């Protein structure tokens, strides 16, 4: 798993932890300068789909993706690592991204608390996940019915328009793809 640090925006933290109503909201805004977040990145196995319905202009998309059990365990491993980093930095509590507002108050209880969230129907869907696909959403292929761009990166629907970024990569890169993208360009 990879980690990225940075100050989380108040909106992101409120959405993740439901700290946006009444007294909780006031307390959160007063204490916001003491909050931080780590993003846990992990490769997935690419079992997602983007469904488009309606006309090209004004239509709608629906994104469908589910985490496998192995990915769920990898994500929990990343949560444990992030929690340890926060406690080592002096955090008094670590909030897990769950709908139940689960928190750990010491590094000694962290593993048990993270492990209490199971993959089963309630576990997987109790996690608040923010997902992005930095790569792989512009499928390359010889069949225009199954791909967005041809084998040379030209968009099937727009002659002369070429894609030359990380969206052409067939899977998530574990290393930074800057040189690969430069070669594609």
Task: Tell me what each language-model feature is.
Residues 24-26, 36, 71, 80-87, ...:
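Domain-level signature for respiratory redox metalloenzymes
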Residues 1-86, 131-136, 156, 163-171:
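FAD cofactor-binding and catalytic pocket of flavoenzymes
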Residues 179-185:
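An active-site-proximal "capping" alpha-helix that borders the catalytic cofactor pocket
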